[in-house]
Amino acid sequence: MASTVMSSLSLKPTFTLEKISVKGLPSLTRSSSSFKVVASGVKKLKTDKPYGINGSMALRDGVDASGRKPKGKGVYQYVDKYGANVDGYSPIYNTDEWSPSGDVYVGGTTGLAIWAVTLLGILAGGALLVYNTSALAQ
């Protein structure tokens, strides 16, 4: 029995993978050129202090909410390395970037008209979708 199995294994041809090239078809093999991804330099945020109330670490009675004294650990130990906004708190409006007079919309009447048309288009599109999927459309 063992000799039969061994002879049947030795009679089978060895499997070889041949490269067949067809004219007009692109090659699917990878080229030998190396691909290297290089990250850009560290982009620091230019602020005087971290945003948010915790940037100054001004704690009442010198302890945090759990009653422990701060050790200077946490995300704020990386302020000098990564920039001030390390905790991910990023306000939409910064007082340094506010307009001196907030009375006039910078976009003007054209900007307001574009905004209104866009809003009406979104609402009309939603109403059309509701109508088309309701029993009223049939």
Swiss-Prot record:
Q: Name one GO biological process term.
A: photosynthesis
Q: Where in the cell is it found?
A: Plastid, Chloroplast thylakoid membrane
Q: Which Pfam families match?
A: PsbR
Establish whether keyword DNA damage is in the entry: no
Superkingdom, according to UniProt? Eukaryota
Q: Does the keyword Transit peptide apply?
A: yes
Presequence extent in this chain: 1-39
Q: Name one GO cellular component term.
A: photosystem II oxygen evolving complex
Which chain positions lie within coiled-coil regions?
none
Instruction: Give the disulfide map.
Output: none
Signal peptide span: none
Q: Which family does it belong to?
A: Belongs to the psbR family.
| Protein purpose | Associated with the oxygen-evolving complex of photosystem II.
Name the chain's protein: Photosystem II 10 kDa polypeptide, chloroplastic
Q: Which organism is it from?
A: Solanum lycopersicum (Tomato)
